[in-house]
């Protein structure tokens, strides 16, 4: 079905350089560009930007 095409699984990698990642899904129709979310990085022990990695 179209489930895999509309809401793919993506990795969000920390920009702090710790290598920590979150795994989530996104809607390609609403967010066609690469996602950037501000989330908690437990390795750096602070909130940092997480960028989508393909």
UniProtKB/Swiss-Prot annotation:
One Gene Ontology molecular-function label: structural constituent of ribosome
Keyword Ribonucleoprotein: yes
Family matches, as PANTHER family: 54S RIBOSOMAL PROTEIN L39, MITOCHONDRIAL, LARGE RIBOSOMAL SUBUNIT PROTEIN BL33M
Matches recorded under InterPro entries: Ribosomal_bL33 (IPR001705), Ribosomal_bL33_CS (IPR018264), Ribosomal_bL33_sf (IPR038584), Ribosomal_zn-bd (IPR011332)
Pfam family, one: Ribosomal_L33
PROSITE patterns: RIBOSOMAL_L33
Family statement drawn from the similarity comment of this UniProt entry: Belongs to the bacterial ribosomal protein bL33 family.
Superkingdom of the source species: Bacteria
GO terms under cellular component: cytosolic large ribosomal subunit
Protein name, entry field: Large ribosomal subunit protein bL33A
GO biological process: translation
Keywords assigned by UniProt, alphabetized: Ribonucleoprotein, Ribosomal protein
């Amino acid at each position: 079905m179209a489930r895999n095409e509309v809401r793919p699984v993506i990795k969000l990698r920390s920009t702090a350089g710790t290598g920590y990642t979150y795994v989530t899904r996104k809607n390609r129709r609403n967010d066609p560009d690469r996602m950037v979310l501000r989330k908690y990085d437990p390795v750096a022990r602070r909130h940092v930007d997480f960028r989508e990695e393909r």
